[in-house]
Amino acid sequence: LILSGDHIYKMDYEVMLDFHKANKADVTIACMPVPIEEASRFGIMVTDDIGRITEFEEKPEHPSSNLASMGIYIFSWPALKEALMSLKDQNSCDFGKHVLPYCKEKGERLFAYEYNGYWKDVGTLGSYWEANMELIDIIPEFNLYEEFWKIYTKGDIIPPQYISADAVTDRCLIGEGAEIYGEIHNSVIGPNVVIGKGSVIRGSIIMRNA
């Protein structure tokens, strides 16, 4: 199982693994439909009726499909080992640009596992900001407080946030240890941040300790 580190989603990998085994796949790629105008930002694939990948192209200028790779892969060890050993002398070895096309050319069984939940690539400042703003929606699509699938993070021993009587807050996430004396609207405030009296914060992400 190979994952990207700049994506936000919730997925039960065991279900994807069962799909991989059931299809006797050498490679399974998690994928989801994206707007066709954004497809050139992703690895794009075309599949047959049973989900086997017939075409794969990394970030094509003129995409033939809108089925995009999520950067989540399950490989059988023999297929991955052969690909990496064969490509080891290259200056670079990217999964989308080199490993997956190599496996496809070798005739390996590549399958697409379609995912229908929330997924966000936060590899740019713009997408990182968008993902944080989505967390403060009235009903967020990606819910940090979902009863049966909570998100647990490192616990710091710091006091709870303090919001003064004169402060104004509206649709915000405020981290522990933060002190709020000003106005905050539609923003995410990290731990140990101090928002001084007279300050007005709108549509922003303030990182910890600021």
PLM region spans:
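Unchanged
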Residues: 1-135
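Left-handed beta-helix
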Residues: 78, 85-210
